[in-house]
Amino acid sequence: LDPEHASAHHHRALLLLFLGDYESGFSAYEWRWRDPAHLARQPSLTSSPWRGELMRDATLLIYPEQGFGDTIQFIRFLPRVAERVWKVIFWCSGPLVPLLRQAPGVDLLWEGESPSPEFQIHAPLMSLPTLLRQTRDRIPGVSGYLPEFAWEKPSRDRSSFLPLRVGLVWRGRSTHRNDCNRSLDLAWFEPLLNLDFLPWVSLQEGAEREIVEHSRWRERMECPDLTDFAVTARVI
């Protein structure tokens, strides 16, 4: 037995979160930093870590540490963070930038490869529930956590589609270590894709989009040009 086994504590945290014990689960989730693989994602920063205290004269840098989906889910906590510090800088890059440019609680969206130099404290995004001491009944954004930003207009007119339209994502990032349990071949959805009354929308880009465009389902599945997550949100 190893009471300090980081991976065991990490999986225990996930189980607690699954059971709805958010306070204990998020607290236990801090064990992820004992995992060398996860620790490698932590940027080299010389500022002090923020502990959730009131610091009205300090600028806080918040950095994402995991995937796009985790970032989108956890930005809901930024307005509450903004109530405790003078200024919030969110370090972000890539296709999420257009989506988060007007996110509530963010004073500056930093897009550089290295962190902005103008901050005194820092915190990882996924630690915010613990730092804010969130319980299940205090989680913000339960009815929608992405306000209406300045969405890009969709590339095609959607008026010709029926009221019920189904967006489909069938593959994740191939480099993910659990990709074998997260991704499927499009052919698995054949019984549903063959239903004439059901219009589909592909929410995939890259090679998966090309697969649809060269498949027999092309006529019944719209493939909008999803250049970034703001466009995707607008399509949804």
Locations of regions flagged by a protein language model:
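Alpha-helical solenoid repeat scaffolds of the TPR/TPR-like class and their adjacent stem/linker regions
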Residues: 1-236
